[in-house]
C-alpha cells in the first residue's frame, strides 16, 4: 500500500 502506497501513501503518496
Swiss-Prot record:
Name used for this protein in its record: Tetrapandin-2
Any one GO molecular function term: calcium channel regulator activity
Tissue specificity: Expressed by the venom gland.
UniProt main location, coarse: secreted
Entry function: Specific inhibitor of store-operated non-voltage-gated calcium channels.
Subcellular location: Secreted
Keyword annotations from UniProtKB, A to Z: Calcium channel impairing toxin, Ion channel impairing toxin, Secreted, Toxin
Entry GO CC: extracellular region
Keyword Disulfide bond among UniProt keywords: no
Organism: Pandinus imperator
